Amino acid sequence: MALPVKALKVGQESYWLDQIARNREEYFSGRGESPGRFVGGDAATSGLTGEASAEQVQAIFRGLDPASGEQRCQPLWRADPRSKLSAAPLLAALKDKAAEQGVGQLPELASSKALAGDVRSVQAACKAGASGRVKVETVERLSRKVLSIDPHTLFGEAFDQAWQHRGKRVDARVAAFDHCFSSPKSVSLLAAGGGDRVRRELAAGRAEALTVALGYLERHGLGVRRDHNGSDRYQATGGLLGVPFEHRMSRAGDPNAHTHVLVQNAGRGPDGRWTALDSDRLYAHLMAADHLYLAAERAALSERLGVQWTGVDVRSGAAEIIGLDDRTLIERFSKRSEQIDEWLAEQGLSGIKASSAAAVATRAPKDRTESEESVYARWTRELADAGVGERELAGVCSDGRGRLVSTEELDRTLTDLGGPEGLTASASTFTRADVVDALAKRLPVAPSAREALTQAEQVAERFLAEWSVQVGRDQRLGIERYSTPELLERERGMVAAATERREEGCGQVRPEVVRTVLDRHATAGPDQAAMVEDVTRSGAGVSLVRGHAGSGKTWALGLAREAFELDGYQVLGAAPIGIATVGLGDEGFSDVRTVDRLLSDLEKRRLELDVRSVLVVDEAAMLGTRKLAPLLDHAERAGTKVLLVGDDRQFASIDAGGGFRALRVRLGASELTVNRRQIEVWEQRAIADVRDGQVEQAVAAYAEHERIRVFDVRDDRDRALVDDWWQAHQAKEEPVVYAHRRAQVDRLNQVCQRLRADHGELGAERLAVGDLAFAVGDRVVLGANALKRLGVANGTSAEITALDVPRRTMTVRTLEADPPRTVRLPTWYLDGEVRPGQSRRLTSPMPGPICAPKAARNSGRCSPWTAPRTCRASTCSSPARRSAPTFI
């Protein structure tokens, strides 16, 4: 789902001016949408109540009061983006020049302070990110006076184009926001074929819902920033100035009722000054406003037309009108969504930002030549062809009525929200907006749009008062954060119990045993040796290790395991995900299982712990409190030492609760800080930047070291990606291509598999598994945990060594286990659990596909080559040709 708001810069008003001109002209001729009319408290204060004119929309974008012409927001003058060029080619040329002349620092190339400043500006631009740019004047000076070359050598015609705009300035303000409120498809279908009276009632109901949503945003989401003792603080403003534009169809010509609300980015604070709105506060309340709109719309349409609704999709907040909720019918009239999904699949992208980009990339002009009468006649015919005629449409408008929530329903809803599957199911804290959002999706249809809002807000206040505990406040945004007593009590009890075990004296290894192990492994670094000493000698019931990316923590855990076992302890290994247990197995842990399996075995008494047991949990920072707490309870009752290993700054917990972080703050942790994975210093710094949240700096480092390739055409990108994969494959580097979307993964797998088959690397016999076919020699990835029965985990890479087509089994050799293992996969495992392994889905937030040789995956040397233009994709080459960063 796309984010229901878009920031609009100065200069983007042409679309809205077109809306004004066309809508006014075509509305009265029966061909266009209804004209936009002013809404909001700010508009009312300014006396703006009628239709918006083109001049008034221009005033909105120019930061003026549309009524008086008074200047509200001052221009933010910046160099025209068209007068800038990418800094990366210039920096690369400067580095080459410095290498030729034996100069250590790039500014030393300059013959004057001014030119040295230009050099530093290029360096700063690259550090700002891969899209860093510099003024064309800087390019011209450095090219001619430092590099002694014509700037066209580096930039070609792009230099001439930028030179034409040198010295120009533009207003870089965000002038307005476009809030889009969309109705469910069944509402659009009812409007398409329901007749004039139904359409009037639908329009009135949607207008009521819009009033509810905008009113909520005005009270809770609109404000300005003001300095308070040297830091920004949120302050409320007097309301919004908006212009809604109603639309009845999508760009694909389908029925699609939605409203674009143009909101001026200006607010007057209590001090009387006009400034830009606090966008962070606005975004914090957007989803609640969007789902309140849908709840209010359901109430209004039930009140006006008697429609009844399906259950609400908790993810989208939408419900469909009963009788128009058939999935096939909805998909038949959703061509626009299909266009966006196809574009995302082709580009290999996903997520909110990608969906917004897809909406823009696939945008086509609406057909404005068709009259309103003709449009509705066409839709009526199409609905009839789909089996929805006049009788069916009349049948959905029956005696449906909203109602207030009953006491029993309310208690059940509050209990659910405050329980493990409620607001803290996947996050440890929440805000008032989160509560309103959740209630808008859970409460029954209200008697009216206004009561839908009142009901949600009142119940939210009760929930916060009776079922929540305030745990913090964002002073700048003025937003309180809450948690549930249930989760806090679990975390509090867990930390208290672990604290009481600090002097328990369990799991202690004799000093001479520890020394023997460390002497055997003289390559252990000081931080690794100190960690082994600490966890084996402390005697604490719960010990923690925080290992930075590339610090060799799993290998160091193997040393600790060796010491414990040498002194007679039974060591068990566990991890939140199956593939992480494989890493423990590679380091000598003979008894490993997932945390879910471990908890199940303990609860069903299939596994017993005692004082001579040691439990090592890798990637423990990924565990939510509700899984970590019972695990520690079992260990405490048995007197078992627990070693939790992870990095709370590298991986967030999968479930709610920062249990690992809370324990680390109270108990402390051994730290593994030395990056042993990356070889070059700049790479180590880049990884540290990622860990510290400075992603832009990390990307800038890759750009500065020429690790980023840009493609304008997706096919060119994919060809380069496969070429890199093939080169690494021929070099026996066992490469894997990573991509975001399943469709792109499947396409790349097909290409790679066909390439190997054409070169005679695959067997002739094929085993069909679903819609896939496998041959001997194929690389596969296993998709399910079967540690006990087969000894394989979800995510295990393997190569097919034999097929038994009649019995539908395959034999595979694992590729990343040390040593490799041969496993026969039975029929029950194959279906849906074995997929081609040349390409896999990428779950980390990288911008596109990546080709990673085995050495790169194991050592972290894997280069992202991002393409920030239309492709938004990346590829990488072999570490033999380039060293590269770790993905964490």
Regions found by a protein language model. Name each.
Residues K9-S14, K185-S188, R248-S250, G267-G269, ...:
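Conserved nucleotide-binding/hydrolysis micro-motifs of P-loop NTPases
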Residues K441, V445, R450-V513:
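Interdomain "pre-motor" coupling segment immediately N-terminal to P-loop NTPase/helicase cores
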Residues G215-R233, S448, A757-A764, K788-L790:
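Active-site phosphate-binding and catalytic loops of NTP-dependent enzymes
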